[in-house]
Amino acid sequence: MKTLYSLRRFYHVETLFNGTLALAGRDQETTGFAWWAGNARLINLSGKLLGAHVAHAGLIVFWAGAMNLFEVAHFVPEKPMYEQGLILLPHLATLGWGIGPGGEVIDTFPYFVSGVLHVISSAVLGFGGIYHALLGPETLEESFPFFGYVWKDRNKMTTILGIHLILLGVGAFLLVFKALYFGGVYDTWAPGGGDVRKITNLTLSPSVIFGYLLKSPFGGEGWIVSVDDLEDIIGGHVWLGSICIFGGIWHILTKPFAWARRALVWSGEAYLSYSLAALSVCGFIACCFVWFNNTAYPSEFYGPTGPEASQAQAFTFLVRDQRLGANVGSAQGPTGLGKYLMRSPTGEVIFGGETMRFWDLRAPWLEPLRGPNGLDLSRLKKDIQPWQERRSAEYMTHAPLGSLNSVGGVATEINAVNYVSPRSWLSTSHFVLAFFLFVGHLWHAGRARAAAAGFEKGIDRDFEPVLSMTPLN
């Protein structure tokens, strides 16, 4: 083993706390890791590590299925999803299952089917996980070389990377096929207040799709989070799926170039750190997406975005006061700016008052009232429809505010209000988890780099201070 690669850089690649690598056994003596170090004991036991991963997948899928069935059992069709603390049914609804015009739930059976399928498949994964963890071969290299690997084998590692990329690409295309051929997906922008429709006219122009990546992340630009039509979203998945599949084929057929061999650390812990970094980035992006985007995450299911609830409040009071005789075009507010309407920095007519900061909001209930120069005064006077008033009043009272103890609403809200938006939950949880994943990335990257440099040996167990302390009992 010692002669494989440069000693300085690649040995000891796996960072053990004591001892050297040994293939058999999963105890501290043979692996250098105690039971609480989890999968670190399985670094060189590919069969057992497979079992751990399959069992983990089983737990994930079981949660999805059980939580899905729990939400179905508690679901009240007469109330909006976002009032019921649901986080899984809104995703199924967004995919167009069981949904009619306006986001109304017309059939809960597809949700039940989804839950049952996940619970059943979790049993298969659970059995596979237990089999490989307890009964299957400890290592796969001898009997099943296709599934075996050595962490330092760069060619094998990029082949595994390629297989993963192909699977991700297939996943992206599943959404494309659902939108194109299998009933379509929910479009919050469909005329008359949202509906399920098949996406026929995909956006495949690279300048449009990759233009999102070149946008500023700030303000009205919003990077990829600013996407606001389904043609772009589904077209983006065509591009993404194709890139993943072709990239996967490339990584299977090729070996890493010399610069990559030199630049990267090639050890199990290094791969773990790369994966944690990637998941962290995904989590931060998902956080922003669910918080700001009301196309991929329709407000009918997830509740309004923060800017949307704020603009809805301004709109609701504009409607009320206009009915009471106010001239909303010229009324002056307490600051000397327009009370109901004012101009944005670039000259558009926007809602006045505190909601001016959210002037770039786009929402299906508001866009029909815009003209070429922002909000159109004549439309505001003549064209406001009852459904727009109802929806804005509903969104105004369901802003994504609230604390962890589920006391919802603004700070002045009475205690009887018990509402926390799924947007708050999903964005907060993804931000927190992304942060933890990032810290894990730093930790494991540091250990992997130190091991590759040959100076990280961990704590010497023989002289660990706790060994000389009085036993607790």
UniProtKB/Swiss-Prot annotation:
GO terms for molecular function: chlorophyll binding; electron transporter, transferring electrons within the cyclic electron transport pathway of photosynthesis activity; metal ion binding. This is Photosystem II CP43 reaction center protein. It is a multi-pass membrane protein. The modification N-acetylthreonine is found at residue 15. SUPFAM superfamilies: Photosystem II antenna protein-like. Belongs to the PsbB/PsbC family. PsbC subfamily. [CaMn4O5] cluster binds at residue 367. It comes from Aethionema cordifolium (Lebanon stonecress). Residues 1-14 form a propeptide. InterPro entries: PS_antenna-like, PS_II_antenna-like_sf, PSII_PsbC, PSII_PsbC_sf. It is found in: Plastid, Chloroplast thylakoid membrane.
